[in-house]
């Protein structure tokens, strides 16, 4: 204010007397006007910055909620089938018992002895389904083709129900890098034709993707059902491995299906992380699965080497999954039947659906990366 008064005095004309209304208006009023203007400008700047931050935070929060809502999308499991060299009982019951079925036995050529499990080659005579028996009799089918047929047969009624409602599933075959994709596609098309199914879109995806085809299917916003099939057959089986296969039929939650088609489980969006970020991946899978850490009592584990199980314990402690820090709460199917290659992760999903229970279950799969997903089994429909 003194600087404004000084400027008025310096600029006041010398030939005018320094008094009067104009003089005192400038001396007393101009500094106050300048002060009010500066305060108003400062306040306007503060308000604009405050509103900018407020709207930015509001937009960021809305965007975060949109991303969380998108991340929490899931696929329903409408059916599954698996083929494994089990002695008796279901796969989930066998793994839950914890008794290893692995045994040292010679390879098919008799060259050496390896601890592993093999699918029987002469089990076609035990087939009850006449349609499946007719398909298996076709000479153009390889071992992979016959396994695809055995996996597909239990799902035929569901696929027929989808076809009647005008919804056809897309078929995705999970194959290893050393398997020619053209051969796998040719075999599944022969099987589909032999079962007289409509022409289904069939593609091959890398077996090392593990559970992540669910993530890709959700990102693509597909409205079709998804039929995933994986087979693990060996000419020279690795130690601690098993032959087998799995097929699982998934569909988006938004897909309207006939009332007679009832889902048996839900798989939430899986998360893939490297080993040093595994804890973050487990935490994110809980968020995507809308599961509180205290509600998860069981985990199905596959693909982890013996020295990597410590990572599971560390990740569980960091995310509040105290119940899963003990081996008793983690079902390790590899120790019971051996590792099933690219089918292992999906066998864990079917085991969780088959085991049932009201609480969410955690799937931990070691493929190309470490993967985690939440599976919720649905209670059977009352008749």
Model features per residue range: what roles?
Residues 241:
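Carbohydrate-active enzyme catalytic cores, enriched for enzymes
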Residues 229-234:
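Generic short beta-strand segments
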Residues 1-213, 217-220, 236-237, 246-383:
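Conserved "HGTGT" condensation-loop signature of ketosynthase/thiolase-family condensing enzymes
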Residues 225-227:
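Short, well-structured beta-strand segments enriched in hydrophobic/aromatic residues
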């Amino acid at each position: 204010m003194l600087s404004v008064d000084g400027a008025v005095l310096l600029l006041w004309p010398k030939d005018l007397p320094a008094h009067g209304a104009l003089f005192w208006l400038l001396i007393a009023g101009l500094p106050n006007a300048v002060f009010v203007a500066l305060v108003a400008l400062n306040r306007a700047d503060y308000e604009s910055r405050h509103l900018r931050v407020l709207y930015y935070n509001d937009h960021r929060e809305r965007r975060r909620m949109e991303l969380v809502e998108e991340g929490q999308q899931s696929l329903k499991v409408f059916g599954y089938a698996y083929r494994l060299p089990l002695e008796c009982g279901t796969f989930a019951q066998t793994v839950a018992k914890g008794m290893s079925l692995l045994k040292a036995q010679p390879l098919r050529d008799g060259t050496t002895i390896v601890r592993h499990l093999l699918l029987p080659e002469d089990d076609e005579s035990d087939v009850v389904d006449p349609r499946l028996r007719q398909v298996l009799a076709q000479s153009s089918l390889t071992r992979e083709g016959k396994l695809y047929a055995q996996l597909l047969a239990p799902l035929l009624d569901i696929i027929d129900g989808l076809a009647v409602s005008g919804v056809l599933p897309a078929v995705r075959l999970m194959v290893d890098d050393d398997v020619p994709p053209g051969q796998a596609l040719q075999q599944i098309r022969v099987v589909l034709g032999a079962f007289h199914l409509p022409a289904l879109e069939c593609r091959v995806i890398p077996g090392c993707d593990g559970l992540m085809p669910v993530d890709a299917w959700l990102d693509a916003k597909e409205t079709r059902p998804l039929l995933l099939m994986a087979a693990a057959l060996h000419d020279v089986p690795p130690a601690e491995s098993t032959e087998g296969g799995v097929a699982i039929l998934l569909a988006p939650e938004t897909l309207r299906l006939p009332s007679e088609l009832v889902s048996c489980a839900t798989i939430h969006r899986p998360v893939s992380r490297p080993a040093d970020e595994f804890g973050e991946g487990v935490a994110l899978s809980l968020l995507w699965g809308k599961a509180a850490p205290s509600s998860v009592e069981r985990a199905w584990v596959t693909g982890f080497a013996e020295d990597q199980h410590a990572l599971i314990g560390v990740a569980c402690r960091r995310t509040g999954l105290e119940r899963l820090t003990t081996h008793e709460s983690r079902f390790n199917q590899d120790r019971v039947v051996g590792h099933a290659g690219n089918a292992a992760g999906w066998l864990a999903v079917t085991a969780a659906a088959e085991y049932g229970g009201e609480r969410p279950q955690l799937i931990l799969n070691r493929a190309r990366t470490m993967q985690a997903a939440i599976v919720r089994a649905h209670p059977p429909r009352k008749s």
